[in-house]
Amino acid sequence: MKTARRRAREFAVQGIYEWELNPDRPASLIEKHLRENEYFAKADEALFRSILYGVLKDVELLSAQVGRYYERAEDEVSPVERAVLLMAALELTQSPETPYPVIINEAIEITKTFGGTDGHKFVNGVLDKLAAEVRGDEVLAQKQRRKQD
């Protein structure tokens, strides 16, 4: 069963994807369209809104952050992968209360649901590098805990 937070992230990714394909469309219309889905009521609305509006507000900064770690040409990154990466970049940089492994795992699972065959591997690689940059202390602590186990 999907959690309310997973649903919120999935709807946010769909909204970011929709915006990527039609950047002149206002976020409020994208949100209205997504709310028509019968499962939207089961999503964490506050998280959905913070991700959708946060990504669209800071898209240039977030794009630059994830783009540094692409190991392929930017035009080879699918719109789904890009939407997931933008969502996760926002959470990694602006939601320190959410552990980075949770953010990366959610991004991988959403990419498996909506993306291409191996898109999740690309997303994982980019986000691992971004997490090391923006949450270095947390990543280091996690690695040290793993060594002790």
From Swiss-Prot:
Disulfide bonds: none
Keyword Transcription regulation recorded: yes
Chain ranges passing through the membrane: none
GO cellular component: cytosol
SUPFAM superfamilies per the UniProt record, alphabetical: NusB-like
Gene3D superfamilies: NusB-like
Function: Involved in transcription antitermination. Required for transcription of ribosomal RNA (rRNA) genes. Binds specifically to the boxA antiterminator sequence of the ribosomal RNA (rrn) operons.
Protein name (Swiss-Prot/TrEMBL): Transcription antitermination protein NusB
